[in-house]
Every structure is written in structure tokens, then in C-alpha cells.
Amino acid sequence: DVRKAIEMFRQVNVEVLGVVENMSYYDPPGGGPRQYIFGEGEGRRVAEAFGVPLLGEIEIDPQIRVGGDTGKPVAAQGENALGAKSLYAMARAVAARLEQAKATSVGPSIQID
């Protein structure tokens, strides 16, 4: 569970950059309303509860699975490849969050007596 993971990382002083909600929604081929098979907005609620950003909502897309199974990930096929848009949006959000964290973080303190 993501809540337990966030709590564990905080206990050991590892910064949590944010939440990524996998299998967030399904867009049927040919249009039609977006379907939230596992419920809507849980990733956002968790992110808000822990005070971290929601970095992405990854869609359910058969092309993501096919790409992984064949060793040809959709993300490697470019942003406009079927199934890749949500992955690229999430990657941009993670990169921006890493830059923000890098600008505000202090490195570890090592003391030798």
C-alpha cells in the first residue's frame, strides 16, 4: 500500500517526491467516456493527505503491456505512440520535481570522530 510505503520512507528520512497512480483510468478505443475501473481520484487523495504532489496518472492501455512483453516499451517509441502520453507526462512531472528537490535539499552530513 502506498500509504505504508510513504510512512516507511519518512521514518528513515527518505524524501518522497510524489505519488504516481498506475492503472488510473481506461480510455476506450473510438471515443466514449473515460472509465475509472478501480475508482477515481485515489492517487490525488493520497498525495494530498501526505502533502506531496500527484506526479501522474498512468492509463490502462494494452499497448503498455504489449510493449513490455515484447521488449519494446511504448515510451521508447516516442511521446505520440499509443499508450505513451501519460508516461511522458509523468516523466516530465518527475523530472521537474527532481529539479525542485535538488535545489532545496541538503546533502548528507558525515561526521568522523
Predicted regions and their residues:
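Flexible active-site lid/hinge loop adjacent to a nucleotide/diphosphate
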Residues: 2
